[in-house]
Structures are given as C-alpha cells and as structure tokens.
Amino acid sequence: MGVAAVGAVAVAPSNSQIVWVGGGDQANARSSMSGDGVFKSTDAGKTWQPMGLPDSHHIARIVIHPKNPDIVYVAAMGHLFSRNEERGVFRTMDGGKTWKKVLYVNDGVGAIDLVINLKTPTQVFAALYDKERLPWQIVESGPESGVYRTDDGGEKWTRLTSGLPGGKIGRIGIDLFQKNPLILYALLENQNPKGASTGPVNSTSPLAQGIVGNELYRTDDGGKTWRKVSGDVNVAGGKAPDSFNQIKINPFNDQQVVVNSDSMFQTRDGGKTWTMDFM
C-alpha cells in the first residue's frame, strides 16, 4: 500500500483472513495526509490489493456484512481542500470489484461514520459531515451534517432529524447497541452559537466558549426520535472536531459510552456524568 496515512481498518466478522483498509487521515486536520482509496487483504494482511475509490482521498470508516464478506460499505470524506464527487457512502456487493455510491448529498459533504445492524444487516446508519478546508478558511460545520438510516441495504436512505439540532453541525460519531439495535447514540459537534456569557473563561475548554459544543444524543426507537442525554456537559472537553475519533457503546451495557479522543472520555450513566482518562 502506497499510503502515508490510514483512516479505517475493518476485519470481516465471517472470515478473519479478510481485512480492509481505507487510506487517508479521517480527522482532516491541519497536516492531514490523503490516501488513494481502499485496499483488501485475503491472507490476514500479508498481501494487499487496491480495490478502488482512489479519488476519495480520506476514508473514515469501513463496515462489513456480518455473514457475507463481499458486501462492504465505505464512508468517504472526499478531497480536503476542494470539492469532488467521490465522497459519501459507497457499497460493493462483489468484494470490491465494483462500487455504487448509495448515499450522496453534494460535492462538499462527506461521510464520516458508519455502523451496521449485526442482527439485521440490511440496516445501516451513516453520519455525514459538511466540511471543507479552504486556504483562507476552514468550513467545519453546516446544515448538511446529519444522521441517516437505510433499511434495505443502501438503496434508500432517510435522514433522522426528530430531536436532533440543525444548523451549524460539525463532526458526528455514531454507534449502535447491538444487543438492542433500537438504541443508538450520536455525538454531535454543535457549532451553533450559545449566546454571550458573563461567567469566567473555562481554561480547560477554551474552544467552546462561543458555541454549544459536543452533545450526546440517544434514540430508543431506531432513530425516529432523539433526546439529548449529556445535559450541559461539553463531551470530550470541547476539543476540536478533529480530536474525537470514535464513539463506542459497551456491548453489554447501554449506559456506558466511550469517546476516543486525544484522551479517553467515558460515561457510565448514559451521558449524565463523564470521566476523562489521559492516554
């Protein structure tokens, strides 16, 4: 693989010899390196073959069907410094020989996260990210960032909006509680202004004084309705959007959620309180 950065790695649940890698930094920060598509190994990483999507540049997530390793979904952010059409969610049904773009909004919106329902693998959730880095400005949020769901393997997608904020939304991380797949968490970087404050500056969260910050939302009905569960806590300490990488639910306890950032943040009470463990 001739890439300087890797944004996603996935192992097929039904065959551990099959490994997929997506090139490019998924964080899209100041010094992000681009990649040249997705690569596949069928011998547990000994050898690799390029499998397409070279113009996607930044692959953020790869998910594989739990029983059929030929069905793969890829979340592509696209070019960092310019608009392009090879972004969104792509699907292959033949192990990477051919690809179909199944979720696409426009040439400035990429896909940043994916999660598949292991019990009903035709159901997939995706998070789209409205972002573009210009030479003179970083556009790191917008109205097209959102959470989507498909129930038919990617042919038709529905944007999930009830209870979720709109407007200037940045990066979104999602995870599904596989024991009860009606439960889904979404961590949203809410860049909408929160209004003027007369209180003291929070030295541990200097970037979040003028915006709402990172919020955790939960759905118990598969995304039909959402509620904020993080209260007034700025989850992940108000870090920049390129600082939190992934959100994960304890597979045995839906009250424990972990956010992977430059530190590890976790809640054991469904988002009410958080602890931070430096790494």
Residue ranges: model-predicted function:
Residues 1-279:
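Beta-propeller blade termini and top-face loops
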